[in-house]
Amino acid sequence: MKSNAAVHRAVCAAIAVVAVSPIAAHSQNTDQLEEVVITAIVDAAAKAANQQKNARGVTNVVSADTVGRFPDPNIAEALQRVAGIAIARDQGEGRYINVRGGPSEFSAVTIDGVSISAPDPSTRAIDLDTIPSDIVGQLEISKTLRPDQDADSITGAVNIKTQSPFDYEGFRARASVGGSYNEFGGTHDRRGSGSVSNIWGDDSKFGLLFSASYSETDREVDNIETVWGRLTRPEGGSVFGIVENLFKDYNTQRERIAFTGAAEWRNTENDRFFVRGTHSKFTDDEYRNQLLVLWSEGVLLPGATDQTASFRNIRVAKQIRHRIQQNEILTVEVGGEKSFGDLVVDASVSMADTEQTYPRRDELLWRTSALGTATAPLSYDYRNSTLEPTISLFTSNQHLTPTNLSFRENAYRTSTTTEETQALVINARLPVTVGGGEGQFKFGLKLKDGERQADENRFRDRASTAAPSSPLSAFLTTTPSRNYGYDLGFKVDPALADAYFDATKKTSPPRVEQSATADYQADEQILSGYAMWDL
C-alpha cells in the first residue's frame, strides 16, 4: 500500500505541474504547450494478472518478471510456484510437473503453441528440466481445456511463450549472471543469460529478437533406496520384508544451453506475420558409486517380522557407473494472422523435434562371496522409526575390505530416441451479437503428423577374462563415500573406471534379446476440428 500511495502522489504531482506550468509560461511570455500526453507503461506482471482475470476457464498466467524474481533454473521449478502445481524432482532439481494432483503423463506442454513430446521413451511426461527458465516470456497454465485447445491432456496444459521483440519499444538489451554455493559437497552452480531485440520501419512494424541462456550445476547427492517384497519364513507363513538395500552416492554435472529467435511484422493487431524458433539442450554427466546389500541372494532365518530379519549367505556388491544423458528440444513455427473485414484468420506451420540419447551408460560391478552364517548372521532392524535403520553389515564392516570383493560383470548401454512432428493449424473467428450480448464464433482445423523411433543396444560380460588387471583396491581413491550415517568405503577413481570402460566396451558381448525388445517405431497422424461459440 505504501508503494501504491507513493505512485499516486507522484502522478498527482506530475498532473499538477502540467496544469500550472502553461500559466506560468504564459505570464513569462514563453512558448505555450498546446498538448501534453502522458503514456503509462503497464508492468508485465500486471498484464499477466489482467490476462488471468479475463481468461475463459481456469487459467494461471505468469510473466517473465515474476519468474525472474526467483532463482529457478528450469521451467519445472518455475511452475511449482503456481497454485495447483507440484513437481517431481531428480537429484534435487525439478523435472516433471503434476497439475491438480494428476500424474505427470496427464499434462500437455507446448512452446509458443507448438506441441512437444517427451524425450524419454519410457514415459509421456515432459522433461521440463531440459528448458531453462531464462527464455520465458510468459507461462500460461490452463486447468480446464477449451475446444480450441489440443485434447491431449487430462489435468491441464502448459504453454511456454518465449519473448517477442514487441514486448518492449525500441532497442533493448538485457544480460544477467548468477551463481550459488552448495554447502553439501562444496560445489558451485553458475548461470547466465542475455537477449537483444529491436523494432524498425515505418511506425515500428518490424522486429527481431535473439536470446541465449547457459547454466551449469555441480552437485553431490546421497540417496538410499529400499526394495521390499514378500518373504517366505522357514517356520511357515510370510512377512513383508526387504529384498535389497541400495546406497547411492552421486557426483553430477548438469549443463543447459538454450537459444530463441523471432522475426515479426505487425501492421495491426490482427494483421501480422512471424517466424520463431527455440532450441534447448540438457546434458547430465553423472558418476554413481553404489553399495548393494542383496538380501534376496541369502537364506532367511527363523524369527523374521515385518520390521526385522536375519539372513545367512547374502551378498554385497560395489558398483561404479558413468552415465551421460542428453535431451534436445527444437521447435520452429511460421505463421500469421489476417483480418478480412470482421473475419480474422490465423494459420501456422510448425515442426517440433525431440531427442534423448545416452552416449554412455557404463557399469563395473564387484561382488562378495556369501556373507553371514547361521551362528553369525547379517540382519536389519527397522523398529526405531526416529533413527536410521540398523543394518549389521555396517557393524561387521565386511564390505570395507577390498579383498572381499571380486569382479562380477561389466555392462554397457547406449540408446537414442527421436520424435519428429509437423503440424498445420488454421483458425477463424467472427464477432457475433446475440440478445444484446457480444461474443464470437470460432472454428478451426489441425493436421498433425508424427514419427517416433527408439533404438537401444545393451552389452554385458561376466567372463573372468573381462576382469580388470588390477584389484578393486587399485581403483579406490582416498575420498570417503558416506551416505547419511552409513560408511560405504572409498569412492572409485572415475578416470581409472573410464579407462577400463573404454578398453573393454568393444569386446563386451551383446544382449540381443534385451536390445531388440527395447526398440520400436510408432507413427501418428491426427486430423481434428472444432467449432465454438464464445459469449
Residue ranges of model-derived segments:
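Flexible glycine-rich, low-complexity coil/linker segments exposed to the extracellular/periplasmic environment
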Residues: 304-314, 374-409, 455-519
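Cleavable N-terminal targeting peptides that direct proteins into the secretory/outer-membrane pathway or into
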Residues: 1-31
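Short loop/turn motifs that connect adjacent beta-strands in outer-membrane beta-barrel proteins
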Residues: 149, 165-171, 201-206, 269-270, ...
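N-terminal periplasmic "start-of-domain" segments of outer-membrane beta-barrel proteins
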Residues: 34-70, 96, 104, 114, ...
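Extracytoplasmic beta-strand/coil segments of soluble accessory domains associated
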Residues: 76-115, 143
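Flexible, surface-exposed loop regions and adjacent strand-edge segments
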Residues: 193, 224-233, 290-300, 362-372, ...
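Outer-membrane beta-barrel transmembrane strands
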Residues: 178, 188-197, 246-286, 315-364, ...
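Outer-membrane beta-barrel translocator/receptor signature
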Residues: 118-125, 134-141, 148-232, 240-243, ...
